[in-house]
Amino acid sequence: MNRFELFSLIYFWLSRFYKNTTDDRVINQLSEMNPFLWDDIGSADPAVYDDYCAFIGDRKITVENSLDIAKGYVQIIDYADITEAFLNVDHEQWEKGCREYLSADHKGADDSK
């Protein structure tokens, strides 16, 4: 799994968790995170993806460690407290979703980072 794929999965998870929210800060965070607004690899607000990449660093991302990395990433987001979305995630459910996403055609599949 590359870092863009994990970023996309985090975005999907948060979008689903907060789909009915009226919290403007969460809505804005999700809007800025949107990895599908532009054709390139990144987010709607490039600074969000840059911060995420800085957090990832040289870390190797696997399906098995991706949930822990995702939990760590949402903890460093200063703009909106979105950590609750990852408090009670079933590890098997997360991994199943990752594998399903990775097995289908998706943006960023050919990104080596």
What do the PLM-derived regions correspond to, one by one?
Residues 69-113:
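Amphipathic alpha-helical binding modules
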Residues 2-31:
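Short terminal alpha-helical segments
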Residues 37-65, 96-113:
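Short, charged early-sequence alpha-helical segments and their helix-coil boundaries
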Residues 21-34, 79-88:
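Short, tandemly repeated low-complexity microdomains enriched for cysteine and small residues
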Residues 2, 6-9, 61-73:
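Disulfide-bonded cysteine-rich modules in secreted/extracellular proteins
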Residues 28, 32, 54, 64, ...:
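Polar/charged alpha-helical tracts
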Residues 12-20, 36-39, 54-62, 72-76:
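Amphipathic alpha-helical interaction surfaces
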